[in-house]
Amino acid sequence: MKEKWLMALASEWDDVKPLITTALESGFDCVVVSRDHIELVRELGSIRIACFGRERGSEDLLIMDTSVPRENQIKSVEKIGRPIGGYVEIRSKEDELFATELGKHVDYLLVVGTDWKVIPLENMIAALQGYDCKIISCVRSSEEAEVALSTLEHGADGVLLDTRDPSEIKRVQAAAERLGMSRIDLKTATVVAVKPVGMGDRVCVDTCSLMRRGEGMLVGSQSRAFFLVQSEAEESPYVAARPFRVNAGAVHAYIRVGDKTRYLSELKSGDEVTIVDKDGMTRSAVVGRVKIERRPMILVEAEVDGERVSTLLQNAETIKLVSHDGTPISVAELKPGDKVLVHVETSARHFGMSIEETIIER
């Protein structure tokens, strides 16, 4: 997830308080403030605080003061030690080269351009790819934020918004969320078997987000094959809609989170999960609660590209897969020949990470 920072260096607290409050409400990750305001920020809420200075204070992250001569900055940051940030204004090629060298010695490199938009940022992103440094691009609008976050394939690691407009803070949050979405390839699988298998422990994942019809999570018994299990976004004659919930399946099952997998049984409050819709568009959500209960289970097997894949779900009419045309289909009505959406990967998994290895899972 891209980081969102707010520059809030006005000397008067009343000038920055509404901006910081909006940043907190919008899920920003860090605010850059004067040291006089550190404790006032902490009274508002929990957010990382960065300050400019020559030595550490009570802030969470020190950013090397720009008044330190450039020839001494790298020595100074090495003496102070990590975590530490650097700040460079890019006005020339010389500035770009200095920023790149400084980035090799800091955790965060804050860069602000004067008459440039993309090219120096591209150069720094490419030059610092092998270093443990996050590039934070200073911007003044959501339009500039979109450019910074999408530069090259990777984009900047985050943006530092310098604005006096609370509405711009919300627009940057929306832009970052939009750019954080990606598409995953979904295929159509043909159901070949549906079989009740008795009792088992199943996992309900209650998130802090509301899902729509056709949205859910990718779950499966194999680490490289996942069924799109829809959220409980629809009402039924038996129970009210719970659009924050995915009744995801048995405790042994894998769930795809980002580009990795986890066991359903491992999930807990505060974890991040990936929501996927019928078109393969993804977004992140936070787990609010996980419920594991003993319930009757049903085995669903399907074939895709000549391969058989499976998952175990609770045997209940409210549990739904997503059909090839995007409509939900209850496991209580599922039958051989039905078409459902799945995601299949070519590589196996080891500790949740994709690897090139021969693994047989049945």
Swiss-Prot record:
Keywords tagged on the record: Amino-acid biosynthesis, Aromatic amino acid biosynthesis, NAD, Oxidoreductase
E.C. numbers: 1.4.1.24
An annotated Gene Ontology molecular function: NAD binding
A Pfam family reported for this protein in Swiss-Prot or TrEMBL: DHQS
BP term (GO), one: aromatic amino acid family biosynthetic process
Stored InterPro entries: DHQ_synth
The keyword Amino-acid biosynthesis is assigned to this record: yes
Reactions it catalyzes: 2-amino-2,3,7-trideoxy-D-lyxo-hept-6-ulosonate + NAD(+) + H2O = 3-dehydroquinate + NH4(+) + NADH + H(+)
Function: Catalyzes the oxidative deamination and cyclization of 2-amino-3,7-dideoxy-D-threo-hept-6-ulosonic acid (ADH) to yield 3-dehydroquinate (DHQ), which is fed into the canonical shikimic pathway of aromatic amino acid biosynthesis.
Similarity comment text for this entry: Belongs to the archaeal-type DHQ synthase family.
HAMAP family to which the protein is assigned, alphabetical: Arch_DHQ_synthase (MF_01244)
Official protein name in the record: 3-dehydroquinate synthase
Gene name of this polypeptide: aroB'
